[in-house]
């Protein structure tokens, strides 16, 4: 039996057109919601793991499955209190944590941070998608703009995670001011660097971010030259225009672009150095003879 998936949602479309004297204008709003549920994974599998995601029966496709964290250890008192309900010290990779280490949640309270402590942390699927198109005309001028966005989804910033491994001599991402590792800035929330040791760079919710965004996808303004100016040139119509794409994005995501494509459906919410959408401005003319 193959994968069986059920998608549910609704779509709402609202449009408006009007004219006041020489001014024409219109608007079109589309809102879409979608939720999916895995009904069968085939071959009686209870789940499928892929990278930072796990797909399970009766859950969404490619749900994030990660270690949950509670900041980093900044005082010795926090380390001393890092114990099970029975008072047993909690070990990370068989060792007690030190100042600047990540504080992982011991989900099963067995005193050992292992893969069994991972938890479901959110869905890569947006709860709502929206697009808004506005257009207007006044005499020989025309204007249009399109916004789109999605809201309520999570993104795992693999690019940031890979840039924090410090397990070899590879190149790594530069730290922003105020986000330096613990050895440099003890007031930041970035854990200490341990060369050759990845305990502070496990697949954790530290790299899980809000993927919501609202973007000005396209904006255009044009002007049609008057026909009497063109008749001696043998031109029926000449329109000058300027257009821009992806000029403005509102988002809290720290990666290059929250609007990316991951072709691996089992890990669709992970951004691994995805190429961003191009920001562009163009000028042109349309000629009709």
Regions found by a protein language model. Give the residues of each.
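Membrane-embedded beta-strand positions of outer-membrane beta-barrel proteins
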Residues: 12-14, 27-29, 145, 240-242, ...
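C-terminal beta-signal and terminal closure region of outer-membrane beta-barrel proteins
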Residues: 1-7, 49-76, 176-177, 188, ...
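Transmembrane beta-barrel architecture of outer-membrane proteins
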Residues: 7-11, 24, 127-131, 213-220, ...
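Extracytoplasmic gating/loop element in the C-terminal half of outer-membrane beta-barrel translocons
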Residues: 150-245
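Repeated loop/turn-to-beta-strand initiation elements of outer-membrane beta-barrel proteins
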Residues: 10, 22-23, 140-143, 228-229
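Transmembrane beta-strands of outer-membrane beta-barrel pores
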Residues: 16-18, 31-37, 138-140, 149-153, ...
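Outer-membrane beta-barrel and related beta-rich outer-membrane complex signature
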Residues: 26, 36-52, 152-180, 250-259
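Conserved small-residue
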Residues: 3-6, 10, 19-123, 245
């Amino acid at each position: 039996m193959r994968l069986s998936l059920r998608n549910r949602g609704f779509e709402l479309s609202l449009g408006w057109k009007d004219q006041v004297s020489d001014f024409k204008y219109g608007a079109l709003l589309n809102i879409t919601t979608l939720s999916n549920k895995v009904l069968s994974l085939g071959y009686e599998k209870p789940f499928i793991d892929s990278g930072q995601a796990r797909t399970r029966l009766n859950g969404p496709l490619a749900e994030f499955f990660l270690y949950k964290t509670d900041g980093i250890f900044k005082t010795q008192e926090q380390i001393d209190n890092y114990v099970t309900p029975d008072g047993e010290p909690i070990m990370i990779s068989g060792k007690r944590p030190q100042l600047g280490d990540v504080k992982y949640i011991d989900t099963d309270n067995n005193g050992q941070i292992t893969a069994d402590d991972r938890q479901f942390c959110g869905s890569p699927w947006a709860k709502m998608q929206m697009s808004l198109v506005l257009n207007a005309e006044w005499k020989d001028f025309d204007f249009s703009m399109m916004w789109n966005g999605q809201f309520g989804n999570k993104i795992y910033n693999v690019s940031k995670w890979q840039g924090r491994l410090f397990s070899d001599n590879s190149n790594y991402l530069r730290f922003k001011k105020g986000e330096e590792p613990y050895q440099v800035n003890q007031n930041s929330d970035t854990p200490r660097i341990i060369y050759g040791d990845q305990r502070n760079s496990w697949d954790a919710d530290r790299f899980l971010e809000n993927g919501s965004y609202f973007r000005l996808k396209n904006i255009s303004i044009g002007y049609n030259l008057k026909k009497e100016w063109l008749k001696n040139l043998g031109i029926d119509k000449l329109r000058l225009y300027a257009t821009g794409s992806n000029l403005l994005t509102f988002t809290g995501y720290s990666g290059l672009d929250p609007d990316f494509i991951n072709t691996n459906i089992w890990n669709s919410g992970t951004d691994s150095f995805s190429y961003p959408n191009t920001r562009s401005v163009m000028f042109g003319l349309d000629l009709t003879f």
